[in-house]
Amino acid sequence: MKKIITLSITFCIWINFYSQNAYAFFGSFNRDKNKEGIYVYKLDTISGKLSKVTSYTGVLNPSFLTLSPNGKYIFACTESKTKNGGSVSSFEFNPENKSLKFINKQKSGGENPVYLTSDKSGKWLVNGNYTEGSVSVYPISENGKIEPLVQNLQFTEGSVNPGRQERAHIHSTVFTPDFNYIFFPDLGADKIRAYQFNNESKEPLQPAEIPFTKTTLGGGPRHFTFHPNGKFAYCIEEMGGAVSVYGYENGKLNNIQRIYTHPENYKDEYESSDVHISPDGKFLYASNRGNEDNIAIFSIQNDGTLKTVGYQSVKGKHTRVFGLDPSGKFLIVTHSGSGTVVVFKRNPETGLLKKVGRKIKINGVSCVQIRKY
């Protein structure tokens, strides 16, 4: 009997250890600050089921979220195409009592903020403004408060598409794995801009030795990610419908491949959006909107190049952002067009995806970030 009890206790401890609390944070285009804007769901790390925990009402269009390194604070872009209407906001999340509390906000320093990220020290927040083509840098205090901006980098030049590239359009702000540099894919200029980063400086961003890398003309670089080994980087091109692969070393990018995210017979307009790599570094996932509404799946070779594995319907409309949970077991897709969220279970051997559970309804959902606590 004692042996059975001991085994039961051990099993319960094992289940508890491998069922750490994981939470999915969703941003949205709520169009009205008197409606829910940020949502928090608990992710069952065994079944993939999402259960609503809390939400926040009182913020307009928190379309993109990022978390502080310790997961205590959530930062949101509050998107606005009105001159000086955008802002960046800070919230505190308490996983013990499941609460989400507003801390403060600052002006975004440019029109239409769309992406922001925190450095590993948690002392700095970097925001990209799409329409105005600028980047704003903010100190973060120990209590999660966003201080007034200390740098505002403005870019102007456009590229070959007069309808989409009349000027610079910063679409993401991504640190290198060592946090010595940060890259800004500029959809409007067909460039990936590079800056050195020093978290001890009062103005932490300075131009890199190579200030930008040119991308395919008319491709429109959008989102950007690094391989876990830090040797390779991947940029998805919204208008080019492709992922460009780069070798990376000390702030420098070297293009080694460009591969389409659509089947060869695809003839419609490209609307590629987001890109992520599985935690084990074996597979890359790229989302396509428009008539495709799918995720392209690629295997990653030893030299960083990609091979197409297949395509998975996202079971919804207009996938702006998706995310992988820290274990790599689940991939969560947001559909801003249909206002739905779908969870897929990932096969770690093949990279293929299988829908699990039911769709979650979140009006205007546009972003997801996932973290274990």
Where are these regions (language model features)?
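An edge-strand/N-cap motif at the start of beta-rich repeat modules
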Residues: 20-44
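Bacterial Sec-dependent N-terminal signal peptides
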Residues: 1-24
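Beta-rich, blade/repeat-based domains predominating
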Residues: 33-34, 59-69, 109-120, 156-179, ...
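Asp-box/WD-like beta-propeller blade repeats and closely related beta-sheet repeat scaffolds
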Residues: 98-172
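Short loop/turn segments immediately following beta-strands, especially the blade-tip
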Residues: 41-48, 91-98, 138-147, 195-204, ...
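Short glycine/acidic-enriched loop and turn motifs that connect beta-strands
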Residues: 30-33, 79-84, 131-134, 189-191, ...
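A short beta-strand motif characteristic of beta-propeller blades
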Residues: 51-57, 101-106, 157-163, 208-214, ...
